[in-house]
């Protein structure tokens, strides 16, 4: 009796064409980040990232080991999507110029360094990672975030179904928070910094 077998064939040209097509749907100045967590979803992190590096503006990864591996052959932005939890890991992230997601209170020490790019995650309805909107307001005041640049981000729970009503609720919650933060910023003394707003939803390889 023959053993069952399976073969996965990865077509790099099709992956590249997918990215080119997706970018054609976006405004010309829109940045494109490739989310390649979990070994590029099992496709092979190194071969995929090297093959698409000329098409993307950065990478989203979870494990520090994967991020340092990709950094060896690209200078583009690398986002650690679940941040770091220790001072040692923070130093590695800092030395490699990684951006960090901050999504819980155990990661707030990252705000003590003003030279690292922070993406502050707000839970608008997915209920997996991130601070509640009212917690973001408190953090904004506690850490004087109107004095530094950071990215406000969220994650759509139903991005595969554009008609789902939860999407609209999440966007509304996100926009309300962003408007509130911008209002606080505009009333501050320093007018040279800008709060960057970014809504993370659909993951494309």
Each predicted region: which residue ranges?
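Histidine- and/or cysteine-centered catalytic micro-motif in compact active-site loops
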Residues: 192
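Ligand-binding/active-site lining segments
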Residues: 186
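Terminal domain-start leader segments
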Residues: 25-27
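Active-site-proximal beta-alpha core segment in soluble small-molecule metabolic enzymes
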Residues: 2, 6-10, 14-17, 30-180, ...
């Amino acid at each position: 009796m023959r053993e069952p077998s399976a073969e996965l064939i990865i077509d790099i040209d099709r992956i590249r064409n997918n990215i080119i097509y997706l970018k054609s749907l976006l405004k010309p100045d829109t940045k494109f980040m490739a989310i390649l967590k979990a070994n590029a979803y099992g496709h092979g992190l190194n071969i995929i990232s090297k093959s698409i590096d000329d098409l993307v503006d950065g990478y989203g990864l979870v494990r520090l080991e994967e991020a340092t591996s990709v950094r060896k052959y690209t200078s583009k932005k690398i986002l650690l999507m679940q941040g770091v939890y220790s001072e040692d890991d923070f130093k590695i992230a800092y030395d490699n110029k990684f951006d960090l997601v901050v999504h819980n209170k155990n990661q707030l020490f990252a705000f003590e360094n003003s030279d690292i790019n922070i993406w502050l995650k707000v839970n608008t309805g997915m209920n997996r990672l991130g601070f509640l909107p009212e917690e973001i307001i408190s953090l904004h005041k506690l850490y004087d975030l109107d004095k530094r640049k950071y990215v406000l981000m969220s994650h759509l729970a139903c991005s595969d179904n554009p008609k789902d009503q939860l999407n609209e609720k999440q966007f509304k919650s996100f926009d309300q928070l962003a408007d509130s933060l911008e209002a606080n910023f505009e009333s501050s003394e320093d007018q040279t910094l800008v709060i960057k707003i970014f809504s993370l939803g659909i993951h494309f390889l």
